[in-house]
């Protein structure tokens, strides 16, 4: 939040809420009646962990989205940007490269990927049910980076879940080597 404020001159409101808790989530809608749209980036995202703890991933990633979608029309929130994943494309075959948004979805290779596929379908069904809500779904291919000021962006603490933090930690001498297999 400090970084955003330094860059923009505006300190964003921050509410720490478990989106699985519908009553707590609704309290945020009530506190901020002028919400115009939602950018939903909140999700568990470690592929390996999702294999070990699949129910946690389904509960967190799917229930949180359902709660948001159920509350949006009641509070006049007209749009949602959803952070999905390239995992909805599965393991692409060489003949299907490069992958475009028109590429066919394949069976997810992890519970994490499956939650993203399920959530995309939930959003599609919700929008096509006549809900007065519009959606954008973003399918990332391992997003990385930070603002040029370095005030906001990726700052992994502990074991990273993406490649670039491993590379930078190795370059800085925090890690002795980077093993590629």
Predicted stretch roles:
Residues 1-37, 159:
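N-terminal Rossmann/SDR dinucleotide-binding element
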Residues 7-9, 75, 130-132, 173-175:
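Short, well-ordered coil/turn elements that cap or connect secondary structure elements
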Residues 11-12, 135, 178:
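Short, conserved active-site loop motifs that form the nucleotide-linked donor/cofactor pocket
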Residues 30-33, 73-74, 128, 172:
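Residue-level signal for alpha-helix termini/capping positions
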Residues 39-45, 84-85:
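Conserved NAD(P)H cofactor-binding loop of Rossmann-fold oxidoreductase domains
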Residues 46-50:
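Serine-hydrolase catalytic-loop signature spanning alpha/beta hydrolases and amidase-signature enzymes
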Residues 52-59, 63-70, 74, 78-79, ...:
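Catalytic helix-loop patch of NAD(P)-dependent Rossmann-fold dehydrogenases
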Residues 143-146, 164-181:
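Alpha-helical substrate-binding/gating segment
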């Amino acid at each position: 939040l400090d970084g955003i404020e330094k860059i923009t001159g505006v300190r964003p409101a921050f509410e720490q809420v478990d989106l699985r808790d519908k009553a707590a989530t609704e309290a945020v809608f009530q506190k901020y009646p002028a919400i115009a749209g939602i950018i939903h980036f909140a999700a568990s995202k470690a592929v390996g962990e999702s294999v070990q703890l699949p129910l946690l991933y389904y509960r967190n990633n799917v229930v949180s989205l359902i709660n948001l979608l159920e509350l949006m029309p009641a509070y006049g929130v007209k749009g949602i940007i959803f952070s999905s994943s390239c995992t909805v494309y599965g393991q692409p075959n060489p003949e299907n490269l490069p992958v475009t948004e028109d590429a066919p979805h394949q069976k997810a290779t992890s519970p994490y990927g499956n939650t993203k596929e399920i959530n995309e379908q939930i959003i599609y069904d919700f929008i096509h049910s006549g809900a007065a809500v519009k959606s954008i779904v973003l399918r990332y291919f391992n997003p990385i980076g930070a603002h040029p000021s370095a005030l906001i962006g990726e700052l992994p603490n502990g074991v990273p879940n993406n490649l670039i933090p491993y590379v930078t930690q190795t370059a800085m001498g925090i890690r002795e080597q980077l093993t590629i297999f």
